[in-house]
Amino acid sequence: MSEPVRKLTFAEADARDDADALLGHEWLVTNGLGGFASSTVACVPTRRYHGLLVSALPTPLGRTVMLNHISEWVRLPNGARFQIGGQERAGGVLEMPGAHYLAEFRLEEGLPVWRYEVDGAVVEKRVLMLHGQNTVHVNYHLAEGDGPVRLKLRPALQFRPLEEAVHDSINEPYTITAVEDRLELCTGHTYPPLRLKIYGLRATFALDGGKLQNVYYRTEDRRGYPHVGELWSPGYFSVDVTEETSATLVGSTEEWELIRALSPEDAQAAEHERRERLLAAADPKARRGVGGELVLAADQFVITPSGRQQDAARAHAAGEEVRSVIAGYHWFTDWGRDTMISLEGLTCTTGRFREAGWILRTFGQYIRDGLIPNMFPDGSNEGLYHTADATLWFFHALDRYLKATDDRVTLEVLLPKMHDIVKCHLEGTRFGIHVDPKDGLLVQGAEGYQLTWMDAKCNGWVVTPRRGKAVEINALWYNALKLLKGWTREARGEASARDLDAHAERCRRSFNERFWYEEGGYLYDVVESWEKHGENDSACRPNQLFAISLEHAVLERPRWDSVLEVAREKLLTPVGLRSLSPDHPDFKPTYHGDLQTRDAAYHQGTVWAWLIGPFVDAWLKVHPEDRAGARRFLEGFVPHLDEACVGSISEVFDAVEPFTPRGCIAQAWSVAEVLRCWVLTSEQAGR
């Protein structure tokens, strides 16, 4: 994997001058804490979330944009100067001189490298973050040509919570402490200082502070948010690079002692070794090629959450660590549902079994009234519990983990909690979640809450409430009962599992009686829908696939083929499944615009990449010998690795061609499910 596995070439003049292409491609580097560095390939920030250092800070701060970008100039020995990178100003002023010199952008072991060519000189830039630290290294090297080449590096910043809109003015002054090759920047706020240090020949810093006004963030504009901001720069660093010596600018919110603990060379070697270990631990079918890329992409989502001291103390007392899963970059935090759906692909397929166990046990500590948290808000220690399915996915995730590890200790720890979950669902718990005693089916619904994975809500408007008896909720409920029955019988004997068996059988019988939509040849999405005044909702959605794809399929076998064929015909695309059939009157073909417009389309046609997972599982249940056919459903994701976030998989796509990627540029369950299915459909290692 040391060779570049993903490369974008900009040798042609038209490619370099295509602003949309350069600004539409993004990159992401993470630090294992939820912090990250990310921007466009052109190094022009277009989102409020873009930054060279977004630190994951302890509660109550959460993730914070600390360093926005660096403006870079190169001076050759002959005196010629050129700028790489750029910025965009309000009023349509796009300054992107570096595009004319950008010959190539590539990923090496998942880390970004830029290659700039000018007047016979080739300068390469690399970005990495130290794992487990809020520290970024930006490295420059003269790959070809005569040296020394002099670099001028001007950092631009505005300390701001990740989710906060960009500011058109900076009210708080920054104070500067400069000592030789290092700089410390502070505000009167509770933010930690931003510490900058330069490594290299003849390194200097010039105090030349000033504001950068009217900075335009085009993606924020398109998404309906404030989009003109102001940044501040303390001055600029100057440093020489040659073919023998590189230069590195370090930005960090850590203490100086930790920042200086590793030289840039040692940091790069350590990260290279860490990534090699990740690949070596993964399933042999996922160590090279597309599989290897996805293993490295998967690593970006597995984190040690910052600030949860109680979690850490509890885990450390047991000789363990705390782990969670970031649902997507840039804006999602750790979500229970996304974590449980992603767990197999992110951890079991990649050989990270210990971390999988830590994740399950961490969420097990947060069970309240038979529910695991739906999500943890940024900068908070407390979870929110408005979900009807995350807890049922917990059973699925535990099952996949046990099949991979046979970890009976974790099962013993969690088994009482799983019984308590079922008890709470049978008796009724929060948000109207309860089993209907008349038919054994699970009901969910509470006014003003979005409880299934189709959870868009804007200004109090729940777009797809799906209150009643939802198809995937009951498929998951049946699966949970059957799994718990098996675990209980193994641990406590047959007699202890009889009640669970009875509940499962009643659910199965009622499901097959109530959910079959004869006219369409598929399953109702919701039975006794509150939105349809007790009638059944016949919207054709991908949720029905879980009645086939889960370990214990609740749908009777003779109906599998029909459901699968309808899903293939109406919902399947090259990059996942539509969330609603195009023949439905509420179908929305594209996902764009302001928040309300986007939310109206979020689950009303928009394609979701992660849904390829249950489709492939269902396909292989119906066609167990046709792995090649199942692999074809994944091939559309390969060219997508060159789009949006290079080397990763987007959250959603438009529902019609050309299936433009939208939403989060890197989504945990998208990567996890494609990786899991890539391995599942591989005939040999490394395909």
Question: What is each model feature region?
Answer:
Residues 1-687:
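Acidic, mature catalytic/reactive cores of soluble proteins
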